[in-house]
Protein backbone atom coordinates (compact mmCIF):
# COMPACT_ATOMS: atom_id res chain seq x y z
CA UNK A 1 0.00 0.00 0.00
CA UNK A 2 2.86 2.38 0.84
CA UNK A 3 4.41 1.75 -2.57
CA UNK A 4 1.13 2.58 -4.31
CA UNK A 5 0.79 5.84 -2.39
CA UNK A 6 4.42 6.71 -3.11
CA UNK A 7 3.91 5.92 -6.80
CA UNK A 8 0.80 8.11 -6.90
CA UNK A 9 2.56 11.02 -5.19
CA UNK A 10 5.58 10.73 -7.51
CA UNK A 11 3.28 10.54 -10.52
CA UNK A 12 1.51 13.74 -9.53
CA UNK A 13 4.77 15.57 -8.80
CA UNK A 14 6.57 14.52 -11.95
CA UNK A 15 3.59 14.85 -14.25
CA UNK A 16 3.29 18.56 -13.43
CA UNK A 17 5.59 19.22 -16.37
CA UNK A 18 2.82 17.91 -18.60
CA UNK A 19 0.49 20.60 -17.25
CA UNK A 20 2.10 23.06 -19.58
CA UNK A 21 0.42 25.51 -21.94
CA UNK A 22 -3.03 25.03 -23.42
CA UNK A 23 -2.08 26.42 -26.84
CA UNK A 24 -2.84 24.29 -29.88
CA UNK A 25 -1.35 24.39 -33.36
CA UNK A 26 -3.68 25.76 -36.05
CA UNK A 27 -5.94 27.32 -33.38
CA UNK A 28 -6.26 30.91 -32.18
CA UNK A 29 -4.80 31.85 -28.83
CA UNK A 30 -7.24 31.86 -25.91
CA UNK A 31 -8.70 35.34 -25.55
CA UNK A 32 -7.16 37.53 -22.86
CA UNK A 33 -7.11 41.22 -21.95
CA UNK A 34 -4.50 43.16 -20.01
CA UNK A 35 -6.11 46.28 -18.61
CA UNK A 36 -3.70 47.13 -15.79
CA UNK A 37 -0.59 48.51 -17.48
CA UNK A 38 -1.01 46.77 -20.86
CA UNK A 39 0.61 47.78 -24.14
CA UNK A 40 3.42 50.30 -23.96
CA UNK A 41 3.10 52.92 -26.69
CA UNK A 42 5.30 55.87 -27.52
CA UNK A 43 4.00 59.37 -26.95
CA UNK A 44 6.75 61.66 -28.17
CA UNK A 45 9.81 60.72 -26.13
CA UNK A 46 7.67 59.29 -23.33
CA UNK A 47 5.84 56.00 -23.00
CA UNK A 48 2.25 55.48 -21.94
CA UNK A 49 0.19 52.40 -21.21
CA UNK A 50 -3.05 51.40 -22.90
CA UNK A 51 -5.27 48.33 -22.48
CA UNK A 52 -4.28 45.39 -24.67
CA UNK A 53 -6.08 42.26 -25.82
CA UNK A 54 -5.02 39.14 -27.68
CA UNK A 55 -7.50 39.97 -30.47
CA UNK A 56 -4.98 42.64 -31.54
CA UNK A 57 -2.51 39.94 -32.59
CA UNK A 58 -4.29 39.18 -35.87
CA UNK A 59 -3.30 41.13 -38.97
CA UNK A 60 0.43 40.42 -39.09
CA UNK A 61 2.69 37.40 -38.79
CA UNK A 62 4.10 37.48 -35.27
CA UNK A 63 6.60 35.96 -32.95
CA UNK A 64 5.09 36.36 -29.50
CA UNK A 65 7.68 36.20 -26.74
CA UNK A 66 6.02 35.74 -23.35
CA UNK A 67 8.42 35.89 -20.45
CA UNK A 68 8.53 36.19 -16.71
CA UNK A 69 9.88 39.51 -15.43
CA UNK A 70 13.19 37.86 -14.55
CA UNK A 71 16.64 38.17 -16.07
CA UNK A 72 16.95 34.39 -16.46
CA UNK A 73 13.69 34.23 -18.45
CA UNK A 74 14.82 37.07 -20.71
CA UNK A 75 18.22 35.50 -21.32
CA UNK A 76 16.77 32.04 -22.10
CA UNK A 77 15.64 33.06 -25.61
CA UNK A 78 17.73 36.17 -26.26
CA UNK A 79 19.47 34.33 -29.12
CA UNK A 80 16.04 33.90 -30.78
CA UNK A 81 15.36 37.63 -30.47
CA UNK A 82 18.83 38.47 -31.82
CA UNK A 83 18.23 36.30 -34.91
CA UNK A 84 14.84 37.96 -35.46
CA UNK A 85 16.43 41.43 -35.30
CA UNK A 86 19.15 40.36 -37.73
CA UNK A 87 16.55 38.99 -40.16
CA UNK A 88 15.01 42.44 -40.80
CA UNK A 89 11.52 41.11 -41.52
CA UNK A 90 9.18 43.41 -43.44
CA UNK A 91 7.38 45.50 -40.76
CA UNK A 92 4.29 45.75 -42.97
CA UNK A 93 3.83 41.96 -42.69
CA UNK A 94 5.62 41.10 -39.42
CA UNK A 95 5.81 42.28 -35.81
CA UNK A 96 7.41 40.92 -32.67
CA UNK A 97 5.16 41.03 -29.60
CA UNK A 98 6.88 40.82 -26.23
CA UNK A 99 4.64 40.17 -23.24
CA UNK A 100 6.40 40.64 -19.91
CA UNK A 101 4.76 39.10 -16.87
CA UNK A 102 5.67 41.66 -14.21
CA UNK A 103 3.65 39.64 -11.68
CA UNK A 104 6.27 36.88 -12.06
CA UNK A 105 9.26 38.99 -11.05
CA UNK A 106 11.59 38.58 -8.11
CA UNK A 107 10.21 40.45 -5.09
CA UNK A 108 11.39 44.05 -5.07
CA UNK A 109 12.29 44.20 -8.77
CA UNK A 110 8.93 45.34 -10.17
CA UNK A 111 10.08 48.91 -10.88
CA UNK A 112 13.16 47.60 -12.71
CA UNK A 113 10.96 45.31 -14.82
CA UNK A 114 8.59 48.17 -15.67
CA UNK A 115 11.45 50.54 -16.56
CA UNK A 116 13.15 47.81 -18.60
CA UNK A 117 9.94 47.21 -20.56
CA UNK A 118 9.62 50.93 -21.32
CA UNK A 119 13.25 51.09 -22.43
CA UNK A 120 12.72 48.03 -24.63
CA UNK A 121 9.83 49.76 -26.39
CA UNK A 122 11.90 52.91 -26.93
CA UNK A 123 14.78 50.86 -28.38
CA UNK A 124 12.45 48.81 -30.59
CA UNK A 125 9.60 51.16 -31.52
CA UNK A 126 8.35 48.83 -34.28
CA UNK A 127 7.79 46.01 -31.76
CA UNK A 128 4.71 45.58 -29.61
CA UNK A 129 5.52 45.46 -25.89
CA UNK A 130 2.94 44.48 -23.26
CA UNK A 131 3.41 44.66 -19.49
CA UNK A 132 1.12 42.24 -17.66
CA UNK A 133 1.02 42.98 -13.93
CA UNK A 134 -1.61 40.36 -13.02
CA UNK A 135 -0.40 37.19 -14.86
CA UNK A 136 -3.50 37.44 -17.06
CA UNK A 137 -1.75 36.12 -20.19
CA UNK A 138 0.20 33.42 -18.35
CA UNK A 139 -3.00 32.16 -16.74
CA UNK A 140 -5.17 32.36 -19.87
CA UNK A 141 -2.61 30.50 -21.96
CA UNK A 142 -1.50 28.09 -19.21
CA UNK A 143 2.17 29.07 -19.42
CA UNK A 144 4.84 28.08 -16.91
CA UNK A 145 6.00 30.47 -14.20
CA UNK A 146 9.56 31.80 -14.19
CA UNK A 147 9.98 30.91 -17.86
CA UNK A 148 9.93 32.08 -21.44
CA UNK A 149 7.71 30.96 -24.32
CA UNK A 150 7.98 31.57 -28.06
CA UNK A 151 4.81 31.43 -30.16
CA UNK A 152 4.58 31.97 -33.93
CA UNK A 153 1.26 33.22 -35.27
CA UNK A 154 0.16 33.55 -38.88
CA UNK A 155 -1.57 36.76 -39.99
CA UNK A 156 -4.97 35.36 -39.00
CA UNK A 157 -3.72 34.74 -35.45
CA UNK A 158 -3.44 30.94 -35.72
CA UNK A 159 -0.64 29.24 -33.75
CA UNK A 160 2.02 27.76 -36.04
CA UNK A 161 4.70 27.04 -33.43
CA UNK A 162 4.86 27.09 -29.65
CA UNK A 163 7.56 26.12 -27.20
CA UNK A 164 8.24 26.96 -23.59
CA UNK A 165 11.77 27.14 -22.26
CA UNK A 166 15.00 27.71 -24.13
CA UNK A 167 14.82 27.14 -27.86
CA UNK A 168 17.48 24.96 -29.46
CA UNK A 169 19.35 26.11 -32.57
CA UNK A 170 17.05 23.83 -34.57
CA UNK A 171 13.97 25.46 -32.99
CA UNK A 172 15.31 28.91 -33.88
CA UNK A 173 15.81 27.84 -37.50
CA UNK A 174 12.27 26.43 -37.55
CA UNK A 175 10.87 29.74 -36.29
CA UNK A 176 12.83 31.79 -38.83
CA UNK A 177 11.79 29.47 -41.68
CA UNK A 178 8.16 29.68 -40.59
CA UNK A 179 8.22 33.48 -40.44
CA UNK A 180 9.95 33.68 -43.83
CA UNK A 181 7.31 31.42 -45.36
CA UNK A 182 4.38 33.19 -43.72
CA UNK A 183 5.53 36.68 -44.75
CA UNK A 184 5.98 35.91 -48.47
From Swiss-Prot:
Subcellular location: Periplasm
Pfam families listed in its UniProt record: YtfJ_HI0045 (PF09695)
Extent of the signal sequence: 1-20
Key word Signal present: yes
Keywords annotated in UniProt: Periplasm, Signal
Gene Ontology CC: periplasmic space
Top-rank taxon, per record: Bacteria
InterPro entries per UniProt: YtfJ_HI0045
Protein name: Uncharacterized protein HI_0045
Lineage: Bacteria, Pseudomonadati, Pseudomonadota, Gammaproteobacteria, Pasteurellales
